[in-house]
Amino acid sequence: MNKDYQKFWSSPSDPVHFEVDTSHEKVESMSESDTMNVSNLSQGVMLSHSPICMETTGTTCDLPQNEIKNFERENEYESTLCEDAYGTLDNLLNDNNIENYSTNALIQPVDTISISSLRQFETVCKFHWVEAFDDEMTEKPEFQSQVYNYAKDNNIKQDSFKEENPMETSVSANTDQLGNEYFRQPPPRSPPLIHCSGEMLKFTEKSLAKSIAKESALNPSQPPSFLCKTAVPSKEIQNYGEIPEMSVSYEKEVTAEGVERPEIVSTWSSAGISWRSEACRENCEMPDWEQSAESLQPVQEDMALNEVLQKLKHTNRKQEVRIQELQCSNLYLEKRVKELQMKITKQQVFIDVINKLKENVEELIEDKYKIILEKNDTKKTLQNLEEVLANTQKHLQESRNDKEMLQLQFKKIKANYVCLQERYMTEMQQKNKSVSQYLEMDKTLSKKEEEVERLQQLKKELEKATASALDLLKREKEAQEQEFLSLQEEFQKLEKENLEERQKLKSRLEKLLTQVRNLQFMSENERTKNIKLQQQINEVKNENAKLKQQVARSEEQNYVPKFETAQLKDQLEEVLKSDITKDTKTTHSNLLPDCSPCEERLNPADIKRASQLASKMHSLLALMVGLLTCQDIINSDAEHFKESEKVSDIMLQKLKSLHLKKKTLDKEVIDCDSDEAKSIRDVPTLLGAKLDKYHSLNEELDFLVTSYEEIIECADQRLAISHSQIAHLEERNKHLEDLIRKPREKARKPRSKSLENHPKSMTMMPALFKENRNDLD
């Protein structure tokens, strides 16, 4: 990185080199003497801009000694004021009571201790100062525009002044050229850079102006032109000649790291350039003041006075312009001072924070040392743990090898155990099956023995029964033959009776059919009557409607009471009911005489059925009468006709059911006769077949008993074999358990020793042993 340096001297006689890195990377702390030298230089620069300083350069010849002394006192007073101002600014940085700033600003002297304490934190706060200045320049475009407009106005005034006085403006052109370069640039967004020319800046001390004033007071006989041309004595010229050796070279760009005083830096640079230009002009115009004093003449003195007067006029004009500029700059500087005061108050807060941070840093340092001690302890413990880990790893490797060997043995034993267990399970299943079969065989054998005993008893009983049955059969044959003959006679009689009954039933059916036909004819007649009655009813309704209309009219004409109308209605209803009962009686009398000749010929069962039908008919007719009384005449006639049709249908259905019952009875009688005859003939054959079946069953039972006995013997043999196998398997299981216990005991002994030596490193091993035990179990 390229670095820009600024070099300052406190005076031409004793140069003190101080370098300030203006780059954004490093800022070197300043000592107390360097800060005082910079403040002295800045005071001289500020005095060069004042109108008093401008007057002293050209008008020292006309001033008396008293005025010169007063002028020097004023300069000294102003310098002390500037020093006090800078001292107050430095004191404000460490002042905790911000409210006492107004009292301390004019009274408190320069506090070098506070400056040195602040210099310690200059490197820390550099980044914050740069950021604050960047924020001010970026956040305040009005400030940038004011600076830019002020530079424009200044340039315009200078151009107009140059047009009026081209001779004298050439001298001051060099002085203002470098000072105005900063203002001619447009307001940038980034922090502004102070551009200076690459020439050597030459500074002189306040002693130059003082020496000029003293010599002018000591030599009043010399003319004013002599004072103007020879304003510097030989000693000062010699000192002035030594300045290039102590000159400071500026780079072209100086970053604005001194954020607190950017305007002072710019004015200081322009003032330094004006000092240099005036000194160069005086060096050019004054070759040797002793030789010029001898060669001058009074005519030349007059010419010089005129020139001096003209120059004074022009300088007065310049001073007026300069005063205006300085007034503007003073206003701006006042604003800037207020802003800086606010910044200083903020910086005081930052200083408190920094003090707190110091305390925190000290605490952190103490904690750091404690942590270092703890770290050393932990290192020692880690070394011990590493040694323990190495030993434990060795033991673990040994235990792993043992574990692998044991696992292999365990797998082999487990495989053998699984095979033996499978065999044991299969043999146990076979044993259970054989035991269950044996029990079932015992049960079946006991049952078969019981059945055999029963069959033998039955055989004896059957033999006795067959003998007695043969005797009985012989007797029964004789009796049955006699009964058969008697039954044949009775059967013939029954056939004759059945034929007679059939003929009677046929005649009854014919009569019933005729009655049904008569009923159908009567129903058709009743339908025609009902149709006629409906027509009559419609006519009666129409007449009733007409009569009602007439009655309503007559009621309107002649008022009739309501109870008389109610009596008339009741009389009409009674008349209608009497007519309906007469019609129902006539229909009932017409139906009953037709059925009377049939009842004489029927059996008592038929008479009962006919009486039931008659009662049902009576009940139906009674219901019909009740319905007719409740309903209108039209509905009653239609329902009466429908119910009569239903009654006829019911009668036909009952007749059909009677015929079907008769047929079923005839079939049953014939079947019974045939079955009885067959049973009497086939009894001996059936008994012989049953005896043959019993004999075959006995033979089968004997064969099964023998086969079951053989099966039981085989099962007993198998049980004996299975018992022997079970005993052998139990012995093997005991042997396997002994083999499994031995490696466990061997593994426990070395593990217990290792656990006693290194208890911490073997904390995870019991879990592994538990898992292995669970697997074994």
From Swiss-Prot:
Biased composition (Basic residues): 743-752
Domain of life (superkingdom): Eukaryota
Coiled coil: 303-560
Keywords carried by this UniProt record: Coiled coil
Expressing tissues: Testis-specific expression in normal tissues, but wide expression among cancer tissues and cell lines.
UniProt-annotated stretches for the region Disordered: 737-777
InterPro entries from the UniProt entry: CAGE1_homolog, CAGE1_N
Extent of the signal sequence: none
PANTHER family: CANCER-ASSOCIATED GENE 1 PROTEIN
Protein name: Cancer-associated gene 1 protein
Originating organism: Homo sapiens
